[in-house]
Amino acid sequence: MNKLSNAFSVLAFADEDAPMASSSSTGKQEESVNGSLEDGDYKQPLVWIDLEMTGLNVEVDRILEIACIITNGDLTQSVEGPDLVVRQTKDCLDKMDDWCQTHHGASGLTKKVLLSAITEREAEQKVIEFVKKHVGSGNPLLAGNSVYVDFLFLKKYMPELAALFPHILVDVSSVKALCARWFPIERRKAPAKKNNHRAMDDIRESIKELKYYKKTIFKARR
């Protein structure tokens, strides 16, 4: 869900060493981008979630797709999680605005939604299981692009999943907005996005974008 630009989200820091309410099981190894990690071995974890919806009005619109990737705080390790298309009715899809009709139709998502047998509740439980497995005792922060909108939809339609996260969000859109004002040259060199408007693709692009800002703008400690 990359079409919003959020210049007003507040960036803050939390005690990320505080334990989660529920910890994951341990023992099984999971492959990551940089090798294998024990379950729950992601330090200062970021839980990247992206939703595709029928629109942006949380009171009437519904979730069509949810994807999740977990990284450590340094963005050097990651594991890809569920990438789920959620069943919604044809009547629900017919009420989408022109933008959603066009883009979700072109991406193939609309057709996949009608063929899916996964409910919102089932999708929520699969993502919760994945997050708890890999976060362990860490206190995860929700991350993404304009992720405050995704968080609103999670609170309404997937409240148990939303409850895993504090109010602090790692919003790449906010970082981008600040870089455009303070480091405009570097901002213009940020990786271009394909804007496929599919949840997992959007997360991968968001992580790539934040890695660029980390390397280019947020200098390493001396």
Curated annotation (Swiss-Prot):
Its EC number is 3.1.15.-. Belongs to the oligoribonuclease family. The keyword Nucleotide-binding does not apply. The active site is at residue 167. It is an enzyme of class 3 (hydrolase). This is Oligoribonuclease. Keywords: Exonuclease, Hydrolase, Nuclease. It holds the Pfam family RNase_T. InterPro entries: Exonuclease_RNaseT/DNA_pol3 (IPR013520), Oligoribonuclease (IPR022894), RNaseH-like_sf (IPR012337), RNaseH_sf (IPR036397).
